[in-house]
Every structure is written in C-alpha cells, then in structure tokens.
C-alpha cells in the first residue's frame, strides 16, 4: 500500500514539473519576463528585488532602471535568468529597460512602495463587484476608488499554468477596482491613506479552498506525523488534478509563480473550509507560514483574519477553528489576527463589511511594521484566576480599557466535570469577573463559544475581543 501511494504522489508531482517545463518550452522566447512584472507594477522599497524571465541560453541580459540601478547576468543553460534590483525609498513613476542583444522590453509607470501578498479562500477572493450588494456601500466605494498609487496583480485561478500570461498590474480606478479583492483593496487603501506611499497587492486567492492546497508537499509530509490520523491518510490518496482543494496544487499553481517577488508581508483570510478538521488547523497554519517564509527566505509579517461568525451546520464547530487561529498567535512569531466577531452574518458565510476586515488587517501592519502608535487588536485572552466562587479573566490588547456593548453575554464556566453553564459577567478594573450559581467550584471559562455569536466585549478603541476557551490557552 505504501509503495502504491508513494507512486501516486510521484506521478502528481511529476505532472506539475512537466507541465511547467512544457509551458516554458512552448514559449521559447528570445527575451521574456515573468508575467508578474508588467507596466504599472510596484516594487518593494528599500529592498533587493528579484526580477526574472527567460531568453536564449547563454546570452547576456542587462537591466537598467531609471532610479539609477543597473544589473547584468547571463542566462543559464535552460535560458532562465534572474537579476537583483536594489530599490530606494518610495517614489516613481519609473521605467525599467531589459535588453538581450537586439531584443528589448520596457516596463513603464513603475512605482516603488510597499508590496503585500493577499491569499486565502472566498472572503479574500471576493471582488468589489462580486455581485450586487455584496459589499457595504458598494456603488459609493467603486465610484470613489481613484487611487493612482494603489495597484493590484491578480494571479489567475488556473490549475494548468496557462492563464497567468494574460494578467498584468492594474491601477485602482472605478473601472479596474471592480476586479480587485475587496479585503485586499481596503487593506491597501488604509495603508495608503495613512502613509501616503504607493501600495502594491499581489492577490492569489481561490474560493472554497483548504489550507492544505496552499502548502508545499514537503511541508505536508513533515507535518504528517503530528496531525490527526484520519486527516493524515488523505495525504496518501490519488490526486485529482482538476480539484483546487487537492493537496499542494494551489501552492504550485497560485503561489509558486509569485516567489521570490519582493514583498513586505502577507495577509490571509481562510479557514471556513477547514472547520471540519479544526483540530489540525493551528499546526497546519503554523506550518504553512513557516514554509512560505522559507520559500521566500524572508521572515516577513503574516497577518490573518479570524473567520467571522456564521451559523454553519450543527455538526460543525467553527468556534474551535476560531480558537485554533487564536492559538497560532502564541506559537508563530510575527503574526497578528484581525478579530471579526462583530461583523458576521448568521445566514451568509461572506460578511458584507469588508471595509473593517481590511482596516483591521492594516492596523496590525501600521503598528508592527510601520511604527504607528495605535491599538491594533481587540482583547485577547491572557489568563484566568479562580477566586471565591467566580473566575477572573485577564486580557491582552485592552487598549484604553474594556467595555461591553449591551449586556456582557456569551460567557460560560465549567467545573471539573467539564459541563458548561451560561454565566453572569461584569467588567471590573479592566478584568472580567464570571460566575454562575450552577457551578460551585469553577475551573474553566469560555466566551463566544458558538458557530454564530455577536460580540459583546470590546476595547474602548472599538475593536472586538476574540472568542476563546481557557482549556486552549
């Protein structure tokens, strides 16, 4: 059995490698650039940025940028070439000239600023005009999207590596922004408005996809022994090359073409499709983050959106997935989580309020990457202490203080028998005191422990607290 499954995996990986080789051989360019480089693009500022392409094997390539940088290289025996361009602080527009003999390519309207990769499933893919009314204040937002220094590149949803050549960078205006990821656009807009510098977004997202599809085969194999046995066995099944949820397929087709483009960090909105295997999610997300950083060889920031409340089915426990996401903050360095416990829609897994999703992701970047003196997160469970018949809960990220919106509902406590009961909660000295007459000797506490829940705990900055269980610190 083991030999057979290893054979299937070998065939799958061989197909991907051969398909990439066939695509390269079919183009046979005298000089070409990777499609991720085009007019209107944004380079990461103050960075050494790779720029790559193909040409006749053994020929000389010269790249000259109008900000004063020049680089030369010779193509390898396969015709591949990569140069490194050092960028100054933000600015532009610039142009870049690439020459090989008599062949020449010129990139125009190139900006230098901050570049972020946006990835995930449908709530990241969700376009500004996905459907009528799909975004709060949709018509107003599209009509007023006039930001010449916000640019986006959409990696096409393509399992065969064919469509990427049809893509290019787009400037944010009412005509182009309709095809922008709403979450990523509002993230970029917040950064741009606060810093007044160019912002570039590389959007590589696909609705309904699981985290395993975005993780490399090597990393999944490394994680195999640490995750649930039923889940691990799925690694060994024959691969379906037409399924975007096939393990590692989006890593190969949607992520790898962007590596090693110079980026500042990653924003990630995914998890709804992994609710059924919530018990593995913290391991999988931690592993994927570390894997991506290894692929880029950069310890970049990684900020993710906690999935929003939604009714799901009675058999699913999305609160467990939310808590798995929260746990990643404690095990994976340079991560942050945008808490969305107040913007869920009971009947729609896709919240219309993408503005606050983008803004809360941007708060993390503004504080942690750009040094803004702001509160960047809602309250996060820190610890609890058993008092005389009640539990006192402490939180990080309380900002200017804790507040309740309406009744401070959603808290439950349990004794040593593990049976939870609704509890009364009140804020005292920026801590939450929780008690129930039905639990004489409380041991554990949890908050927002439902598929759908409307947040009641906030900090004074208006950011909601995360659901949590003290069993999973």
Model-predicted regions and their roles:
Residues 1-28:
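Bacterial Sec-dependent N-terminal signal peptides
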């Amino acid at each position: 059995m083991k030999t057979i499954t290893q054979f299937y995996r070998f065939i799958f990986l061989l197909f991907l490698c051969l398909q990439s080789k066939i695509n390269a051989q079919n183009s046979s360019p005298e000089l070409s650039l990777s499609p991720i480089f085009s007019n209107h693009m944004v380079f990461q500022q103050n960075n050494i940025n790779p720029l790559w392409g193909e040409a006749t094997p053994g020929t000389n390539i010269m790249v000259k940028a109008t900000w004063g940088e020049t680089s030369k290289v010779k193509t390898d025996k396969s015709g591949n070439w990569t140069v490194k361009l050092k960028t100054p602080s933000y600015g532009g527009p610039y142009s870049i000239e690439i020459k090989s003999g008599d062949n020449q390519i010129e990139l125009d309207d190139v900006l230098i600023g901050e570049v972020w990769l946006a990835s995930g499933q449908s709530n990241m893919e969700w376009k500004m005009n996905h459907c009528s009314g799909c975004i709060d204040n949709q018509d107003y937002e599209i009509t007023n999207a006039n930001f010449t220094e916000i640019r986006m590149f959409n990696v096409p949803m393509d399992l065969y590596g064919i469509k990427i050549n049809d893509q290019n960078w787009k400037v944010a205006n009412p005509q182009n922004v309709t095809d922008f990821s709403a979450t990523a656009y509002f993230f970029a807009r917040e950064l741009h408005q606060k810093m007044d510098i160019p912002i570039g977004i590389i959007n590589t997202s696909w609705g309904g996809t699981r985290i395993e599809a975005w993780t490399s085969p090597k990393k999944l194999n490394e994680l195999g022994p640490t995750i649930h046995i039923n889940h691990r066995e799925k690694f060994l099944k024959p691969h379906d090359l037409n399924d975007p949820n096939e393990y590692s397929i989006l890593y190969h087709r949607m992520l790898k073409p962007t590596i090693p483009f110079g980026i500042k960090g990653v924003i990630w909105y995914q998890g709804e499709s992994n609710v059924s295997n919530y018990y593995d999610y913290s391991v999988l997300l931690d592993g994927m983050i570390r894997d991506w950083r290894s692929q880029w060889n950069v310890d970049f920031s990684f900020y993710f959106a906690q999935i929003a409340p939604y009714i799901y089915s009675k058999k699913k426990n999305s609160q467990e997935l939310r808590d798995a996401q929260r746990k990643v903050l404690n095990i994976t360095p340079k991560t942050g989580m945008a808490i969305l416990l107040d913007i869920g829609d009971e009947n729609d897994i896709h919240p219309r309020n993408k503005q606050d999703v983008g803004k809360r992701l941007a708060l993390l970047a503004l504080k942690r990457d750009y040094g803004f003196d702001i509160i960047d997160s809602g309250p996060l469970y820190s610890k609890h202490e058993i008092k005389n018949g009640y539990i006192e809960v402490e939180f990080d990220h309380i900002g200017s203080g804790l507040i309740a919106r309406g009744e401070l509902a959603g808290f439950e406590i349990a004794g040593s028998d593990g049976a939870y009961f609704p509890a009364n909660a009140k804020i005292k000295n920026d801590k939450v005191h929780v008690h129930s007459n039905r639990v004489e000797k409380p041991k554990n506490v949890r908050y927002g422990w439902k598929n759908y829940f409307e947040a009641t705990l906030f900090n004074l900055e208006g950011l909601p607290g995360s659901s949590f269980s003290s069993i999973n610190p």
